[in-house]
Amino acid sequence: MNKAILHTIIIYTLASCPYCIKAKALLDEKNVVYEEIEVSNFTQEEKEKFIKKSGGKKTVPQIFIDNIHVGGCDALFDLEKEGRLDKLLEGQPKKKMPAAGA
């Protein structure tokens, strides 16, 4: 079994949300692969599932690492300040770096 498949980061966002942009920038800085899910076109049922999955939170971003709800942008940056984010991201797939000269 491929262990990389077990590791996932999902971030629920809105395109124009500055907190979403900031959270994605931190994840990009960490060079980890994440799945971004845009919530603006969610059906009512999808919205309800999102809110339930997010522990009642209706705001974005909402970030999940290995199916564990981390929280929003502030929570992500708090983990970084506390030195705990890198530990949570251990084993996450890294983004492929472009070849030299590409």
Curated annotation (Swiss-Prot):
Residues 1-96 form the Glutaredoxin domain. Its main location: cytoplasm. Disulfide bonds join 17-20. GO terms for cellular component: cytoplasm. GO terms for molecular function: glutathione disulfide oxidoreductase activity. CDD domains: GRX_GRXb_1_3_like. It comes from the Bacteria. The keyword Cytoplasm applies. It is found in: Cytoplasm. This is Glutaredoxin 1. It comes from Rickettsia felis (strain ATCC VR-1525 / URRWXCal2) (Rickettsia azadi).
